[in-house]
């Protein structure tokens, strides 16, 4: 199965902001962005040249792809579905990305990062409405109950991720019972509930060319 093998800290430095790809490390002063807040590579500290409009749009698309851990072909499919839905395409895009099972598992705190959450899903560690689902791109619907299997509940990494997430608080669109390792996807998030650093309008402009 294809996946992005670029070092995670390098991806964050390329985008110039934290993408929270390495679990708890991203919340400490060991984060690469805290120590080297410039692009990777030989000329990283001198890469301040202005980008074209197309370059800015492409950079934003790459950032969103990396943030959600989605490959190009998958991203295009999600975008096509966002276009078909009623409402604003950009907001639809973010809602669909947040509705992926790996994203929901991450937001519920079952994994410390989306990569960890994706692995948990693939290894049959997650139930949706009482049934095992091992497809990270599975679309979670409002009202669906997502929970850890009995086996995954006892994993130290999962316990640590849940404790850290509970201390930070959970998103409003989720109802999470951290002790039970279970949560309900109440609704798709509103745009105001998602990171303001994302500019989905640039992606819409890019694909409208």
From Swiss-Prot:
Role: One of the primary rRNA binding proteins, it binds directly to 16S rRNA where it nucleates assembly of the body of the 30S subunit. With S5 and S12 plays an important role in translational accuracy.
Domain named S4 RNA-binding: residues: 99-164
Lineage: Bacteria, Pseudomonadati, Pseudomonadota, Betaproteobacteria, Rhodocyclales
InterPro entries linked to this entry: Ribosomal_uS4, Ribosomal_uS4_bac-type, Ribosomal_uS4_CS, Ribosomal_uS4_N, S4_RNA-bd, S4_RNA-bd_sf
PANTHER family linked: 30S 40S RIBOSOMAL PROTEIN, SMALL RIBOSOMAL SUBUNIT PROTEIN US4M
Keywords: Ribonucleoprotein, Ribosomal protein, RNA-binding, rRNA-binding
Name of the protein in question: Small ribosomal subunit protein uS4
Biological processes, Gene Ontology terms: ribosomal small subunit biogenesis; translation
Keyword rRNA-binding in record: yes
Alphabetized GO MF terms: rRNA binding; structural constituent of ribosome
Subunit-structure text: Part of the 30S ribosomal subunit. Contacts protein S5. The interaction surface between S4 and S5 is involved in control of translational fidelity.
Family: Belongs to the universal ribosomal protein uS4 family.
Organism: Aromatoleum aromaticum (strain DSM 19018 / LMG 30748 / EbN1)
Gene symbol of the encoding locus: rpsD
Keyword Ribosomal protein on entry: yes
GO CC terms of this entry: small ribosomal subunit
Matches recorded under NCBIfam families: PRK05327.1 (NF003717), rpsD_bact (TIGR01017)
């Amino acid at each position: 199965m294809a996946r992005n093998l670029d070092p995670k800290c390098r991806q964050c430095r390329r985008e110039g902001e934290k993408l929270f790809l390495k679990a708890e490390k991203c919340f400490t002063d060991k984060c690469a962005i805290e120590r080297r807040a410039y692009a990777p590579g030989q000329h990283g500290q001198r890469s301040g040249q202005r980008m074209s409009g197309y370059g800015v749009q492409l950079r934003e698309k790459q950032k969103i792809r990396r943030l959600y851990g989605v490959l190009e072909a998958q991203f295009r499919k999600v975008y096509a579905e966002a276009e078909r839905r009623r409402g604003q395409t950009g907001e639809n895009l973010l809602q669909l990305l947040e509705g992926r099972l790996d994203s929901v598992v991450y937001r519920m705190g079952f994994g410390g990062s989306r990569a960890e959450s994706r692995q948990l899903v693939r290894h049959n560690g997650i139930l949706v409405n009482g049934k095992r689902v091992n497809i990270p791109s599975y679309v979670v619907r409002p009202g669906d109950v997502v929970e850890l299997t009995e086996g995954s509940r006892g994993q130290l990494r999962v316990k640590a991720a849940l404790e850290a997430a509970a201390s930070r608080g959970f998103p409003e669109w989720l109802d999470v019972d951290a002790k039970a390792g279970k949560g309900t996807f109440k609704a798709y998030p509103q745009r105001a509930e998602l990171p303001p650093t994302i500019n989905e309008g640039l992606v819409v402009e890019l694909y409208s060319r």
